[in-house]
C-alpha cells in the first residue's frame, strides 16, 4: 500500500466529521463501490439501507480502514486519511482510528477476557489511567443495563448482552463517531429491541453514528438522513420521511415494497 504524508493542510467542512468523495473499491474484477460520496455531520445519525450485496458493509469497512479503497478521498475532520487513492502514513491512520468506534453484527468480543477487560483493554493500551478507565467502564455498563456483569465472560451472556458489551467497548475510547454494521442481525426479535433501545438513546444523546441496518422502522425513527444503496452506488438519500414516505427512485420504491411484504 502506497503511503505518504497527505495532511499538510486542512480541507473540507468543519461541520462534517467524516467526508467521503468518489470512493471506489473492487474485489478482483467485481466493482463493489462505485464513486461513493457522502458526509456525516456531528451529532447526526446516518442509516444505510439496501439489499444484501449492495456494498453497505464494504463502505463501512473502507471508512474504517478494514478494507483498502482503490480510489477516492476519506477525510476525518477535514484531514485526509485517503487522498486520490493514496493513504496517509500508518501513524496518521492509527491517529484516525482513535476517532471512531466499531460495532459488528457478531459482537467480536474476546472470549477469554472478562466484560471489564473487553471494555477497558483499548483505552489502557492507549495509555489512559487504569482506574479512570475502570470507572468509565462501570458507568458504561450501567448505561447499557449491565450492572453486575463486569466479571462475567462472553459465554455467560445472552446475545443481546454481548452486543451491549460491544457497544460499551466501542464507547470506552470516547469516539467522535460510531459505526454499526447490522448490529441486530444475529439477535432474536426480543433481544433486537433491547439493543435498538440502546442505540436510540445514543442518538438522543447526539452521538454521531453511521448504522448499516435492515431495521427499517428504527432507521426511519432515529436517522437524520437515510442512504439507500444498490449495486455499489447510492441510489437515493435524504430525510427519512422522504426516503421512506415518498422515494423518488423506482429501485428504492421496489426495495421498500419487497421489504414490507
Indicate where each model-derived feature is located.
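Conserved ABC transporter NBD signature motif
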Residues: 72-84
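Catalytic Walker B motif of ABC-type/P-loop ATPase nucleotide-binding domains
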Residues: 178-181
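Conserved signature/switch motifs of ABC ATPase nucleotide-binding domains
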Residues: 152-155, 173, 205
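Helix-to-loop junction immediately C-terminal to a conserved catalytic motif
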Residues: 64
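ABC ATPase "signature
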Residues: 237-238
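Short coil-to-helix segment of the ABC ATPase nucleotide-binding domain corresponding to the Q-loop/switch region
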Residues: 113-121
